[in-house]
Amino acid sequence: MAVKDFMTKRVVYVSPETTVAAAADIMRDKGLRRLPVIEHDKLVGLITEGTMAEASPSKATSLSIYEMNYLLNKTKVGDIMIKNVLTVSKYASLEDAIYIMLQNKVGVLPVVDNDQISGIITDKDVFRAFLEISG
C-alpha cells in the first residue's frame, strides 16, 4: 500500500506572504491543524497551530486586544513557519510514512513529487487507512 492510496489530494495551502491571522482563519474555517506553505509551486514550509501559538503574544501580555490583532495581521507566515519540513514520496509505502511520523513525532507529511506537493498525509489519514485495511 502506497502513500498515494491514502493521502489527501486536495491540499489547502498558504503562501509565505499570508498573514498569521489569515492562516488562522483558513485553518478554523476548514477544520485544519496545519497548512503547507507554497511559493512558486514549491513547498517552502509548514505552519501549524503550535507554531502560531508560539508566535502569538502571551496571554499575560500588557498588549491590548487591538495591539495583538495588529501584530497577527502584520506577521507573515514566512516569518514563523517550520522551514525544514519532512516529506514523503507518493510511492513510499504507508508503513514508511508511519515510521517517519512516529520517529519524528509529527502528525503530517507533505507528499512531494519532483519538488511539487501532490498531497498530504496526516495522522487522520493513517487512522482511516487502518480502518479500511482492517475491515
Predicted feature residues:
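The conserved cystathionine-beta-synthase
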Residues: V14-G31, V37-E39, M81, T87-K105, ...
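A glycine-centered beta-loop-beta connector
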Residues: M27, L35-T51, M101, L109-D125
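Short, charged/polar low-complexity linear motifs in solvent-exposed/disordered segments
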Residues: G31-R33, E39-H40, S62-S64, L72-N73, ...
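Short N-terminal signal/transit or membrane-insertion segments
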Residues: T8-E17, L43
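Tandem CBS (Bateman) regulatory domains
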Residues: M1-R10, T48-V85, I98-L102, T122-G135
